Amino acid sequence: MANKSVTVGQLEIANDRPFTLFGGMNVLESRDMAMRVCEKYVAVTNKLNVPYIFKASFDKANRSSIHSYRGPGMEEGLKIFQELKQTFGVNIITDVHEIYQCQPVAEVVDIIQLPAFLARQTDLVEAMARTGAVINVKKPQFLSPGQMGNIVEKIVECGNQQIILCDRGTNFGYDNLVVDMLSFNIMKKVSDGCPVIFDVTHALQCRDPFGSASGGRRDQVTELARAGLATGLAGLFLEAHPDPNTAKCDGPSALPLDKLEAFVAQMKAIDNLVKSFAELDTACRD
């Protein structure tokens, strides 16, 4: 199976290329916080020579509670993204939830993301595809990896071949997620070699069944990220925060920002090792 590549700015993203770090924060909390987090990621990835794309949401439209913080909104969020690009020269990924958001967001950021909960909404998928932007498709928690081929087909039928697929865990009963390490290879196959990345942060979510916000297992982020990258991926999706306990969204799953350099160094070492191996064809044939 040949690996397809997606070009974002000067970066080439593919399953057989050095992994790209899609990193930042869950939601834009403020302009100053975004600058602080982005600055740290840029410093670490420049030092370690790791390709980097900044990620954050301007609106978390699928929060559990109506009282939860959602973000600054599209207009203010795009202004912050523009400042980050001008200041740090970063490429940016963010998600959209409504059809009207697709074109204006695609004019500012480099990758638009299809949220997991919305990945089968055909009208939204088509609107995103027709922008011509690179699209990152989050695998829904309720969907098998093999079904991702149908979403890819919708995008391709709209004339867009710039597709990245992302796993963020699968429902394991109520209010819990697990990651099937075989799913990455299945997603590569059903997409004919599209880049596949792993959202380790959201895979760590674990809810209180009666609570109004997601819990998490940040103490297991290193082990889970190591395991994912050991399968040979195009990228890792990671959220970090200076003080995860006070983060406005998904703090329990976020990496403490001061641990970022040590974490990324480990991930790079694993990625380098795995991609130094020759690929073995172990399929049984008559």
UniProtKB/Swiss-Prot annotation:
**UniProt pathway annotation:** Carbohydrate biosynthesis; 3-deoxy-D-manno-octulosonate biosynthesis; 3-deoxy-D-manno-octulosonate from D-ribulose 5-phosphate: step 2/3; Bacterial outer membrane biogenesis; lipopolysaccharide biosynthesis
Q: Name one GO biological process term.
A: keto-3-deoxy-D-manno-octulosonic acid biosynthetic process
UniProt cross-references to Pfam families, sorted A to Z = DAHP_synth_1
Q: Name one GO molecular function term.
A: 3-deoxy-8-phosphooctulonate synthase activity
Record's catalysed reaction(s) = D-arabinose 5-phosphate + phosphoenolpyruvate + H2O = 3-deoxy-alpha-D-manno-2-octulosonate-8-phosphate + phosphate
The entry's keywords: Cytoplasm, Lipopolysaccharide biosynthesis, Transferase
Q: Where in the cell is it found?
A: Cytoplasm
**What family name appears in the similarity comment?**
Belongs to the KdsA family.
Which PANTHER family does this one have?
PHOSPHO-2-DEHYDRO-3-DEOXYHEPTONATE ALDOLASE
The record, for HAMAP family, names: KDO8P_synth
Protein name listed in UniProt: 2-dehydro-3-deoxyphosphooctonate aldolase
Can you name the source organism?
Haemophilus ducreyi (strain 35000HP / ATCC 700724)
**What gene does this protein come from?**
kdsA
